[in-house]
């Protein structure tokens, strides 16, 4: 009888141990990103500003902010490519497919870059694919938090992100039905290259594809737009 009680006690202890390990695992998973973010905030430099060459998407590409931003990023690292080459070689998809579905910016640029009001946007995957044709140093950093993005900027890496025209959260997000499923899109979608920041002032510097070099924007507003647009980012290793 005594042996049976001990056996049951051992089983109970083992079960409790597994439960505690499981709870701890969930806690660690939930808080891992927060811990990384807090560490990155503590360790980034007080300020940074890089001399990334500025380009203007106009007049050739009224809807070509993404390839223009990507061209700026690649040219900073002396990759011999132009926005025209990128625009020509990135995958394109029609705005409407089969009369029922919208084009998917995760698959290619939706519409026309060269015709005002006839094009939409393109997301990280086609941008990565076209950049990879010219350099194997390109990295897709999509899904990382904004502070992790800024840690790379602190370390001397300009980063291209998908934001919005005014670099702040918008209220005109749409949900498109595409062949691959539902996709969030805004007519205010806009790309830029983060070139630096001032940590104390909570200012981020961006190269705006409308020809504005090191434009100062609100850190919090840019972060909000970055999150709303799916945390899409590319940089060079």
Model regions and ranges:
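Structured segments of extracytoplasmic/periplasmic soluble domains
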Residues: 68-80, 89-96, 130-137, 151-155, ...
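Predominantly the structural core of cysteine protease catalytic domains
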Residues: 102-188, 197, 235-236
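Active-site-adjacent structural segments surrounding the nucleophilic cysteine of cysteine proteases
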Residues: 2-3, 7-125, 165, 172-176, ...
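Envelope-exposed proteins and targeting segments
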Residues: 61, 157, 188-190, 202
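Noncatalytic regulatory segments and standalone regulatory/sensor domains
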Residues: 173-181, 185-186, 193-237
């Amino acid at each position: 009888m005594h042996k049976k009680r001990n056996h049951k006690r051992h089983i109970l202890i083992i079960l409790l141990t597994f439960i505690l390990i499981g709870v701890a695992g969930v806690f660690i998973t939930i808080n891992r990103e927060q811990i990384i973010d807090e560490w990155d905030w503590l360790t980034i430099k007080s300020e940074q500003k890089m001399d990334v060459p500025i380009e203007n998407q106009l007049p050739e590409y009224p809807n070509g902010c993404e390839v223009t931003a990507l061209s700026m990023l690649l040219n900073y690292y002396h990759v011999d490519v132009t926005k025209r080459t990128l625009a020509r070689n990135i995958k394109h998809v029609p705005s409407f497919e089969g009369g029922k579905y919208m084009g998917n910016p995760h698959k290619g640029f939706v519409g026309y870059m060269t015709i005002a009001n006839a094009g939409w946007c393109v997301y990280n995957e086609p941008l990565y694919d076209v950049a990879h044709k010219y350099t194997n140093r390109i990295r897709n950093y999509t899904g990382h938090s904004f502070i992790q993005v800024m840690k790379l900027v602190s370390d001397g890496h300009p980063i291209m992100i998908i934001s919005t025209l005014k670099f702040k959260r918008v209220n005109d997000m749409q949900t498109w039905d595409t062949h691959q499923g539902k996709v969030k899109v805004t007519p205010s979608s806009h790309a830029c290259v983060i070139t630096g920041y001032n940590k104390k002032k909570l200012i981020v510097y961006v190269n705006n594809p409308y020809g504005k070099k090191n434009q100062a924007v609100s850190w919090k507003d840019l972060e909000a737009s970055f999150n709303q647009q799916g945390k899409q980012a590319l940089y060079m290793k």
